[in-house]
Regions:
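Generic alpha-helical structural element
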Residues: 3, 64, 225, 260-263, ...
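Conserved N-terminal alpha-helix of the aminotransferase class I/II PLP-enzyme fold
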Residues: 48-93
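Short glycine-rich or small-residue beta-strand-to-loop segments that form or flank ligand, phosphate
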Residues: 58, 85-87, 165-168, 328, ...
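Conserved PLP-enzyme active-site core in the AAT-like
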Residues: 10-15, 19-21, 39-42, 63, ...
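Conserved C-terminal alpha-helix-loop-beta "cap" of PLP-dependent enzymes
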Residues: 295-396
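N-terminal "arm"/small-domain region of PLP-dependent enzymes with the aminotransferase-like
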Residues: 1-66
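Structured loop/turn residues at secondary-structure junctions
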Residues: 90, 115, 170, 332-333, ...
Length: 396
């Protein structure tokens, strides 16, 4: 069958399976929900009916030959990749599979200090040796930045035997390094470029966004579809570039070392549907998110004492670009640490932020944010300043 981006092969196969009224004498033991009515009442019948085991009509994640294979090919096309692997152990598994695919025990990898623990754990279990590059730091905001091209190039020169360079794109706070230039330099020295795009799904679909890994020519990227792409928590993509020179079979073998053999069809179908949604409507969705984030920034900055920062931070070096969908808010000029504002928002206003640190709170924006939710956040921040604000806590 010839599929287009308007198709969702896994979802479509699940719907056919559901209509067939198959009698299950396989796992899972809840048997379409009949074996656990309490769980069925909680999750709903549709969810329980499609929480099924691998079988011929539904393919097998460990060795896909039909609908999962077709869904992965559609995702690769949508993201401009050579291959795409559906991951159900989270982007942690994607990051670890990237590192294990290109490095072996004793190999060096050039990597920023502010990497996710998944990358650290991958190096621990594999025996890969890190060559750390310190990211820049904004001392007023107290946040890590990207890597300077000069520092990456020096690390490459000092470690010509390194196998790969690892880049965050973007960071939690929306900061992007000069990914194109880093990729160009790394490739000139025979090194692979691995990109943690856990917070960068939207970079593949929005206009005027920071460059994504595949467009920049990187070799592999770990993409958290569930963070900003609308799939279910724990679902992720692992992308391999068209010119990476890394075989699909090799990467699949690495993935199968650690990924479950019981791939959840709830997670798989959510990846399939989210890919379809963004492939067909992504430009409009991303424009909506940017508009919402920009409005929130403007209104928050009007309050006074808060600083919701954006691309005015860009310096062409360790802040080469800024992801405007990230709503990062500096709080210390109202006399409160970010974590204090985070706790007050949660405990007193029932507003759950993504994180709070010593100087900032972060809101993750998506197409699911409503204008009234943004107004509620702005109003809460204004009231927090009035009720709890103190003399400025000063700079970090």
């Amino acid at each position: 069958m010839q599929y287009t981006q308007n198709n969702a092969p896994i979802y479509e196969a699940l719907m056919k399976y559901n209509e067939a009224r198959v009698v299950p004498f396989d796992v899972p033991g809840h048997k379409h929900g009949k074996g656990n009515p309490l769980l069925t009442e909680f999750l709903g019948q549709t969810c329980m009916s499609v929480d099924v085991n691998s079988m011929k009509p539904l393919d097998n994640l460990c060795h896909p030959v039909s609908v999962i294979r077709d869904a992965e090919r559609l995702a690769a096309e949508a993201f401009g990749a050579g291959h795409c692997f559906f991951m159900v152990n989270g982007t942690t598994s994607s990051v670890q599979s990237m590192i294990l695919s290109v490095c072996k025990e004793g190999d060096k990898i050039i990597i920023p200090r502010n990497v996710h623990r998944s990358a650290i754990n991958a190096m621990i279990v594999s025996g890969v040796v890190p060559v750390y590059v310190n990211p820049g730091v904004n001392h007023k905001l107290g946040i890590p930045l990207g890597m300077s091209v000069k520092d990456v190039e020096q690390a490459i020169i000092d470690n010509p035997d390194a196998k790969a360079v690892f880049v965050n794109n973007p960071t939690y706070y929306g900061i992007c390094s000069n990914l194109r230039k880093i990729t160009e330099i790394a490739h000139a020295h025979g090194m692979k470029v691995l990109v943690d795009e856990a917070h960068g799904t939207h970079l593949y679909f929005g206009e005027n966004m920071p460059v994504n890994a595949m467009t920049a020519g990187a070799d592999m990227a770990a993409v958290s579809m569930h963070k900003t792409g609308g799939s279910l928590t724990q679902s992720s993509f692992l992308l391999v570039g068209k010119n990476a020179g890394i075989s699909e079979g090799h990467v699949r073998a690495i993935i199968n070392l650690t990924q479950t053999t019981s791939g959840s069809y709830l997670l798989l179908s959510s990846l399939d549907i989210a890919r379809k949604y963004y492939a067909t409507q992504g430009r409009e969705l991303c424009a909506q998110v940017v508009k919402s984030a920009e409005y929130a920034r403007t209104e928050i900055n009007k309050i006074g004492g808060y600083y919701a920062y954006s691309d005015e931070l860009v310096n062409g070096d360790d802040i080469f670009a800024f992801d405007k969908t990230k709503l990062s808010i500096y709080t210390r000029d109202i006399g409160l640490a970010g974590i204090e504002v985070y706790d007050i928002l949660r405990d007193s206003y029932d507003i759950q932020m993504e994180l709070g640190d010593i100087g900032n709170v972060l809101a993750i924006m998506s197409p699911g944010d409503r204008w009234k939710d943004i107004e509620r956040l702005v109003s809460a921040l204004s009231e927090i300043k009035r009720r709890f604000g103190k003399e400025s806590a000063g700079h970090v």
